[in-house]
Amino acid sequence: MELKGTKTQKNLETAFAGESQARNKYTYFASKAKKEGYNQIAAIFEETAANEKEHAKIWYKLLNGGSVSDTLTNLKDAANGENYEWTDMYDQFAKEAREEGFNDIATLFEEVGKIEKEHEERYRKLIANIEGGLVFSKDKDMIWQCANCGHIVVGKKAPEKCPVCDHPQGYFQVKAENY
């Protein structure tokens, strides 16, 4: 059966949005409970947030052909979403907030829009890395670090597997020092 255009599609979209928002809200509630010294309550909020994430994933998958797409497709989707947010959505929201006299909120929309632009640029670079075969291979020697055990390798390419902990190449990343 075709889902597109049905009430069920609309209901799935609403369920996905509701579960996604609940997850975030419960995460915020957990943080507040923890700060107030209610560790058990924080843990219950965190557990419920994890449940809501899984509920949202059920609805998301049903809306998207039964699965989550491959990483390259997901990066392209994410980049396009971030582009919309900084070029259209937040720009429009800022204009409307300013027209209504909410200058502080307008400024926040503009500043978040700048962050969304950075997100898009980061995703576009990752897309180029995948398409160019440059995720685990570079043109010059790099310091590669295993994210599991911390093993360091210097070279143009990350090893197929870590010689220390045996984790696959996917655990290697270019070591970044920002300290």
Predicted regions and their residues:
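Non-heme di-metal
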Residues: 1-179
